[in-house]
């Protein structure tokens, strides 16, 4: 397998945005692959036999090959490569990415085997270790960041968005001593649904400016393709406001930082929270690594078996094509009056000789030992 990857370790989130692919356009161009894109990572997994049309398209990405690429996926599914170590969302993201590629008929049996094992490994890790206990999502990390920087007691909080990440933010907020929670979303019904779970209030998206004005902390997590909050929208806002933008692409434009009463935090700032999170989970990492190694060993055997099955399938196809070709020659000879017994004798000899000659032509010093062992076993098992 071949992997091209870029994530929060080597790029700021704003830079990652520029590297993101339009999924539909990507899959029109490439086959035999799975594209995994989250708020802080972009990873493209190619089948070992895939043809990469434009290698320059991945010039900004780190390239990882073979077993290292496979192990990376298992570690990612287990939450070890996440900014928030042990977070659960990555399993669903990997599962959804694989499902989309499969629906588009872009995966292979080889990739399917690896991705299913990665998902299984991630689930096993969380069921058998404590790697995902405590603050283990981007949403909960954003709330923790707000608590550390400005405090949450008696604050009014505005959550912009009502999707998966916004819901994680909401879940983390429920436990805090907050004065009020407000939810705004482009689809008002979704905002209303989330607000109801929080005993909060929903506001229409066209009233977002007013909602910002009346809240102390604004956490943005929409799926908008472009910034929805900029300097112009905030220039008349009164009072000190803290904005935490955990969307990707970003919801808040950088120009808001020019306003003296606005403090902006982004996903990059969550690294402070992630470092504390890592300390709490350090003792669990060896247990996770052990499970990964065990599952990787099982996967290696599965892939070896898969490779053998493909080899047998290809060899069977080769023999069948050879049989048909020689049989047609034999049938023509019989139709032209040749003795069937003589023809069958000739057919069997030509067929056997052709098998041997084709076989001998591809043998070299590197393969002779393996072939010798196979032939010896065949002779021992001969009928």
Swiss-Prot record:
It catalyses: (S)-4-amino-5-oxopentanoate + tRNA(Glu) + NADP(+) = L-glutamyl-tRNA(Glu) + NADPH + H(+). Homodimer. GO terms for molecular function: glutamyl-tRNA reductase activity; NADP binding. It is an enzyme of class 1 (oxidoreductase). Belongs to the glutamyl-tRNA reductase family. Possesses an unusual extended V-shaped dimeric structure with each monomer consisting of three distinct domains arranged along a curved 'spinal' alpha-helix. The N-terminal catalytic domain specifically recognizes the glutamate moiety of the substrate. The second domain is the NADPH-binding domain, and the third C-terminal domain is responsible for dimerization. Pathway: Porphyrin-containing compound metabolism; protoporphyrin-IX biosynthesis; 5-aminolevulinate from L-glutamyl-tRNA(Glu): step 1/2. This is Glutamyl-tRNA reductase. One of its GO terms (biological process) is protoporphyrinogen IX biosynthetic process from glutamate. Substrate binds at residues 38-41, 82, 87-89, 93. The record marks 72 as: Important for activity. InterPro entries: 4pyrrol_synth_GluRdtase, 4pyrrol_synth_GluRdtase_dimer, 4pyrrol_synth_GluRdtase_N, GluRdtase_dimer_dom_sf, GluRdtase_N_sf, NAD(P)-bd_dom_sf, Shikm_DH/Glu-tRNA_Rdtase. Catalyzes the NADPH-dependent reduction of glutamyl-tRNA(Glu) to glutamate 1-semialdehyde (GSA). Its EC number is 1.2.1.70.
């Amino acid at each position: 397998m071949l992997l091209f990857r870029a994530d929060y370790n080597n790029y700021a989130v704003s830079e990652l945005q520029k590297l993101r692919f339009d999924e539909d356009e990507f899959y029109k161009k490439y086959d035999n692959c799975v594209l995994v894109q989250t708020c802080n990572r972009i990873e493209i997994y190619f089948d070992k036999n895939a043809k990469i049309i434009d290698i320059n398209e991945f010039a900004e990405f780190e390239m990882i090959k073979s077993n290292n690429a496979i192990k990376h996926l298992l570690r990612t599914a287990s939450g070890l490569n996440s900014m928030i170590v042990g977070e659960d969302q990555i399993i669903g993201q990997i599962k959804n990415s694989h499902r989309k590629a499969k629906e588009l008929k872009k995966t292979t049996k080889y990739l399917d085997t690896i991705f299913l094992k990665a998902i299984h490994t991630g689930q096993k890790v969380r069921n058998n270790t404590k790697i995902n206990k405590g603050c283990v999502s981007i949403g909960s990390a954003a709330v923790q960041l707000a608590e550390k920087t400005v405090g949450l007691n008696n604050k009014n909080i505005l959550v912009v968005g009502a999707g998966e990440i916004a819901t994680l933010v909401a879940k983390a907020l429920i436990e805090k001593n907050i004065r009020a929670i407000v939810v705004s979303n482009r689809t008002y019904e979704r905002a209303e649904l989330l607000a109801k779970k929080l005993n909060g209030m929903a506001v229409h998206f066209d009233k977002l400016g007013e909602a910002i004005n009346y809240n102390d902390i604004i956490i943005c997590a929409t799926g908008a393709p472009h910034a929805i909050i900029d300097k112009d929208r905030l220039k008349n806002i009164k009072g000190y406001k803290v904005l935490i933008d955990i969307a990707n692409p970003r919801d808040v434009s950088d120009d808001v930082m020019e306003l003296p009463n606005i403090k902006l935090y982004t996903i990059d700032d969550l690294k402070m929270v992630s470092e504390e999170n890592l300390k709490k989970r350090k003792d669990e990492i060896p247990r996770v690594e052990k499970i990964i190694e065990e599952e990787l060993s099982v996967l290696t055997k599965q892939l070896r078996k898969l490779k053998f099955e493909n080899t047998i399938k290809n060899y069977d196809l080769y023999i069948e094509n050879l049989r048909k070709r020689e049989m047609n020659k034999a049938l023509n000879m019989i139709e032209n009056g040749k003795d069937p017994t003589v023809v069958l004798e000739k057919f069997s000899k030509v067929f056997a000789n052709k098998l041997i000659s084709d076989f001998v032509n591809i043998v070299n010093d590197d393969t002779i030992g393996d072939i010798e062992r196979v032939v010896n076993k065949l002779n021992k098992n001969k009928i």
